Amino acid sequence: MGSGSNNNTTLEDLARLAGVSVSTVSRALNDQPLISTRTKQRIWALARDHNYPFRHYMPAGPIGAEGSIAIVTPHMRGRPLPLSHPFILELLASIGEAARARDCDFTVSHIAPTNYDDLVHATTTSRASGVIFIGQSALHEALNQLASTNARFVVWGAQMPGQRYTSVGSDNLLGGRRATLHLARLGRKQILYLGSTDPEAMQRRAGYSEALAESGLEEDPKLVVPVDFEWESAEAAVGRLIRRHVAFDGIVASSDLIALGAIRALRKAGLSVPGDVSVTGYDDMLLSRLSTPTLTTIRQDTHEAGRLLVSRILDDSSDHMPALLPTDLIVRESCGG
């Protein structure tokens, strides 16, 4: 029916034509975030064709595109996670490729949330179809609170107890366990753990503890060292341990960047990797393949992560359960076997 038709069309008529519920039509006409941009645009087109009065919203993203996505990085330990971090760059690239495959635009927001109000601001000030938060930081309960609203969002991060929001992340517990078991099987007895205190790193630490117990090794509190997410923090921490004559023959790092910082400190002290100390990382960034020695690490599937994060925003699906991606041990030169 063209623009010359009468204006007696009802919400029920639009719902029947669109093959959706009346409530979905109502939400779409009010541009509510729980409805995907594709569904909104289909309902808006029907409303226009049938002269149904509504506020004409501009589509998010390029004309004809499926929508747009905003990417937000919360504060980590009191400051924004740097977008220049190699893993963040790889994850952003995967999100971008997945968005392009769906003819969807994406933007990286300047907002770095530290509390619930910041999360609300991030999800309500954007014209995007939804928001991808990179990491939970200390915002798990605030994200649970946000999930009770109409905000459309997904989190890259750990699965947490009592979680009510959708997340995509890797099996951090298994990844930490695999890295530690590998060192134990190589005969390493005094294995140092270096990691930040964000939820993902803490799960990797739990895997480290499980593997030590499974290998009959006692966990030494002196060998569990919190570090920042930058390589400089790891280099400084390992340097201090060496100067204090704390003995260790293996390192499980919660990221590749932390592992590379540790290797710098070992080299400055005249120690050989892997001759004196075997080192494992986590992420399998490009740098891990280019370093000397090349880095044994735990691979996260960022390509699949990007695809799932984008689909959780754009697809009308009731299957918004958290997704746990497998991790793989990638053995290279830094462990010597």
What kind of region is each of these model predictions?
Residues 68, 188-190, 249:
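Residues that mark the start of a beta-strand
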Residues 77-90, 108-116, 167-178, 194-239, ...:
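Hinge/beta->alpha junction and helix N-cap segments in small-molecule ligand-binding domains
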Residues 128-135, 192-195, 224, 245-255, ...:
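Periplasmic-binding protein-like
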Residues 149-153, 189, 274-277:
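A short helix->loop->beta-strand "cap" motif at the edges of active sites that frequently abuts
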Residues 239-337:
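Flexible loop/turn connectors
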